[in-house]
Amino acid sequence: YLFDCGAGITRNMVRANVSPGDVTAVFLTHLHHDHICDFPLFVITGWMWDREDSPVVIGPRGTAHFCRNLFEGGAFKADFEARAHYPRRQQNLAAVRPKVLECEPGLAYQDEHVTIRCDWVEHIPRQISECFGIRFEAEGKSVAFSGDTAPCDAMVRLAQDADLLIHECTFPESFIRHRAKTGVGIYSHTSPRQLGEVAVRANV
């Protein structure tokens, strides 16, 4: 299971001796470039490494459009056609045909191993770009993952009593104030102090 697919994810997985083809599902918290830019490499590498099934991709509204315009007939059309020329790659085309689940707050994904719930967080106004935080539960343990967000009640709920909270902490408060004054990132991100307050409220 993979949460977001930013720069270097695929390379780091390979370095850790984890095959991208072994990842059951990918959850994209939102569709900003720094959270999805490695996704094409992740999918194509899985294809090249003989993945047989379609990767499950869970994300906000727009995820299906994003995936549909990447490979066959999309931005990576030339790459796809070159690799698909080989008979072996013709046999596992499912690997570059993701199964997309666009989620709403609540239960986003469940299989025999994991349960993933999500809720909207406060990064960008929702009518522009949906952004999700998630709670991942497996083997009696829970992990909360914020994606990008300002402090918000939804993330506190997702993180409540979790075994691990992975929360963004991008800028100090002085820079968050500066961004607000310049009209950039009025909602956006969480400072170190604010993250401490979220953790206390969530009892993690």
Describe each region flagged by the PLM:
Residues 133, 142-144, 150-204:
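Cap/insert and terminal regions of metallo-dependent hydrolase folds
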